[in-house]
């Protein structure tokens, strides 16, 4: 089992993402470790040139100090795996550092002293790294360049909130207007209204044993089922001891097996970026091959409901697939 699969499964089991200190978060990302190494070397060259220079501009000294602060923040954020939470801060910070480094480079590059020339070379290297960081942290994880860069990381491609939001906004149109490939794949759409299950239904995954699932328990031990019919549709809600409406994994899969048309329950088309082998101890995961086309639904969380061409349903890690806007082009 790959590290990405193990980490994704741990995130599914726990409703809250835990962030632990690990050098692997930094070392396992070639982009982060390479750019940080170059910036560290450039910063040391700049610092050495500034110390040896008799007349170093005060503005340049502040630029050197600010660059050091941003590099420390970069390391801390990566070690605690908080990049997605502080992308805006990093983009803004390296933008300010880019202004300092470029201005200092322009002031020192025309000086005759070799020490100042060394300082200008260091500032030039820092400017290049800062520009690369601005493009990376200023873009969403779904950006083509970011996806290509993250594909070399051990943790794989990062989840994109923007991509999920855009897909959700198109869901109504996708359900109302069946596409040719989807129609041929599943036999067409018959005009059902969309039934949407929020990703909050994924909470409570501690019950991973299919034999103890209470989705359709008929015995006296199973929780009481309520059938809510507000708009002519049937939705099953499991009563819990604390009175909330969260369901177990068996309940949510039961929803998809009994609620009718597949295109309503799985309105999106996804293409597998990598092959994935389901955990044999988890009956709700499904395996798929690289390049395989799947129908998916409830794309808010890190684990999505999915259905394969052979009718097999289950859950898949979202960072192993990408949504396809035009299934007819596949």
From Swiss-Prot:
Disulfide bonds: none annotated. Residues 52-58, 110-116 are extracellular. GO terms for biological process: establishment of cell polarity; osmosensory signaling pathway via Sho1 osmosensor; regulation of actin filament polymerization; signal transduction involved in filamentous growth. InterPro entries: SH3-like_dom_sf (IPR036028), SH3_domain (IPR001452), Sho1_SH3 (IPR035522). Keywords: Cell membrane, Membrane, SH3 domain, Stress response, Transmembrane, Transmembrane helix. It is found in: Cell membrane. Its main location: membrane. Residues 1-30, 80-88, 138-330 are cytoplasmic. It comes from the Eukaryota. Pfam families: SH3_1. Belongs to the SHO1 family. Forms homooligomers. Plasma membrane osmosensor that activates the high osmolarity glycerol (HOG) MAPK signaling pathway in response to high osmolarity. PANTHER family: FCH AND DOUBLE SH3 DOMAINS PROTEIN, HIGH OSMOLARITY SIGNALING PROTEIN SHO1. This is High osmolarity signaling protein SHO1.
